[in-house]
Amino acid sequence: MKKFYILVVVMIFQFAHAQDSERIKLDIIEIGQVLDAYHAAAAEGDWSTYFDLMSEDGVFLGTDASERWIKNEFRAYAGNRTGWVYRSVTRNINLTPDGMSAWFDEILDSLSYGTSRGTGVLIRTNEGWKISQYHLTFPIPNELARHVTDEIKAFEAGN
């Protein structure tokens, strides 16, 4: 009888673990869909959708060191602009153990800038996953880093 109870407990834990694994897979799919929709909305200049995908206290960090846009400031900046096109090439998504937050990194491609990287954080809300922070950067090959950073230093010294 004791073996039976142990077997039942083991089966319950396995079932719970399988459900957790399935939930994580579904969350990763949903987060990927949010990020894809975010990029699609930017490309179309659909600012209503774009900003609805951000949390109320969402922040966008741009490529310029001065660009730290809180959601409402960024909405005003975007205004009637036509948008920007970035296509995700690769993406990695991780969830916190409690499943309430996620972080990601993705390599992007655009006709304007070529390779870039997006990183950020999403939070689970009653309305689904929302982007709490998005950070766009230009990865610099190590062989070019010294030259590029020297150019940035010279630029900053001149301003």
Predicted regions and their residues:
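Positively charged n-region of N-terminal signal peptides that target proteins for export
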Residues: M1-F4, Q19
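Sec-dependent N-terminal signal peptides
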Residues: F4-F13
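Short, low-complexity N-terminal intrinsically disordered segments enriched in polar/charged residues
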Residues: H17-D52, D150-N159
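Short beta-strand segments and strand-loop junctions that repeat across beta-rich extracellular domains
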Residues: A42, T119-G128, I152-A154
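A short gly/proline-enriched turn/hairpin at secondary-structure junctions
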Residues: E56-R68, G79-W84
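Surface-exposed, charged secondary-structure patches
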Residues: N72-T115
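A short, structured loop/turn motif at beta-sheet edges
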Residues: I93-M100, L122-K130
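Low-complexity, intrinsically disordered terminal/linker segments enriched in charged
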Residues: Q133-N159
